[in-house]
C-alpha cells in the first residue's frame, strides 16, 4: 500500500474535464445553431451534458474534501489562489465588454447618427426595474455576508436561513432581468447599442445564474453538515464570486443603464 509523504492532493484520473469541455462545445455550437437555424437540439444536448458533469464533478470533490480529508491546509491555500486568479480573469472578461460599450458611446460614428443612444433607440428607464435589480443584488450581498459570519460563529440555523434568502434574491434578480429583456423596446440586433447592452448584461445574468447554482449547492451542503466554522472553502469561494457579481452589476448599472441612457 502506497503512502504519501506530503500534504498535497494527488487527484485521481477523472472523465469530467473532457465531458465538461464537450458540453461547452455543444452549448456554444448550439447557441450559433439556435441563432441562425432556430434549432435548439444541440444547445439542449450541451446543457444536459453540462448539468450531468456538474453534478458528478461536484459529488467527487465533496467526497474527496469532506469525507476523505484530501483538502488539507496547503490544498485549501492553493484553491484560494486559484479562485482569486479565476475572478481576476473574469474581471478582464467584463473589461472587454465595457471597452466595447465606451468605444461606441464616447465617440458615436455617423452610422449611429453621431449620438448616443443612437437614433431610433428608446433606452430603458434606469430608475425602474434596473434600480430594483440593484437593490435586490445589494441586499443579496448583505445576506451572503450574514451567512458567512453565521457560519464562522457556528450559528448553523442562521447560516441556512440567510443563505436561503440569498438564493431567493438571486433567483428574483434573474426573473426581473428576464422580464426586462422580454419587454425591452430594442433587441440584440439593434446595432452597437443593442449588442453591447445585451451581451454585457446577458453575460452578467449568466454569472448570476452560475452564482445562484453555486450558492444552492452550498445551501444543500450546509444542511448536510459539510461545513465547519473553520473549514468551509466551498462556501467562501461562492461568497467571493457573489460579491464579484455584485460589483460588476454596479458598474453595469452606472455605465450602461444610467450614463448610457
Curated annotation (Swiss-Prot):
What Gene3D superfamilies would the database entry show? 1.10.287.70, Cytochrome c oxidase, subunit III, four-helix bundle
Q: How does it sit in the membrane?
A: Multi-pass membrane protein
Stated EC number for the protein is 7.1.1.9
Keywords attached to this entry: Membrane, Mitochondrion, Mitochondrion inner membrane, Translocase, Transmembrane, Transmembrane helix
Q: Assign the protein's first listed, main location to one coarse class.
A: mitochondrion
According to the UniProt record, one GO cellular component term is:
mitochondrial inner membrane
Q: Where in the cell is it found?
A: Mitochondrion inner membrane
Question: Where in the chain are disulfide-linked cysteines found?
Answer: none
Supply the InterPro entries for this chain: Cyt_c/ubiquinol_Oxase_su3 (IPR024791), Cyt_c_oxase_su3_dom (IPR033945), Cyt_c_oxidase-like_su3 (IPR000298), Cyt_c_oxidase_su3-like_sf (IPR035973), Cyt_c_oxidase_su3_a-hlx (IPR013833)
Record topological domains on the Mitochondrial matrix side = 1-15, 67-72, 153-155, 224-232
Question: Which terms does the record give in the GO molecular function aspect?
Answer: cytochrome-c oxidase activity
Q: Which GO terms describe its biological process?
A: mitochondrial electron transport, cytochrome c to oxygen
List all membrane-crossing ranges: 16-34, 41-66, 73-105, 129-152, 156-183, 191-223, 233-256
- Any Pfam family matching the protein: COX3
Q: Write out the topological domains of type Mitochondrial intermembrane.
A: 35-40, 106-128, 184-190, 257-261
- The superkingdom listed in its UniProt entry is Eukaryota
Which catalytic reaction applies to this protein? 4 Fe(II)-[cytochrome c] + O2 + 8 H(+)(in) = 4 Fe(III)-[cytochrome c] + 2 H2O + 4 H(+)(out)
Oligomeric state and interaction partners are given as: Component of the cytochrome c oxidase (complex IV, CIV), a multisubunit enzyme composed of 14 subunits. The complex is composed of a catalytic core of 3 subunits MT-CO1, MT-CO2 and MT-CO3, encoded in the mitochondrial DNA, and 11 supernumerary subunits COX4I, COX5A, COX5B, COX6A, COX6B, COX6C, COX7A, COX7B, COX7C, COX8 and NDUFA4, which are encoded in the nuclear genome.
The entry's family comment says: Belongs to the cytochrome c oxidase subunit 3 family.
Q: What is this protein called?
A: Cytochrome c oxidase subunit 3
- State the organism named in the record: Latimeria chalumnae
The top of its lineage is: Eukaryota, Metazoa, Chordata, Craniata, Vertebrata
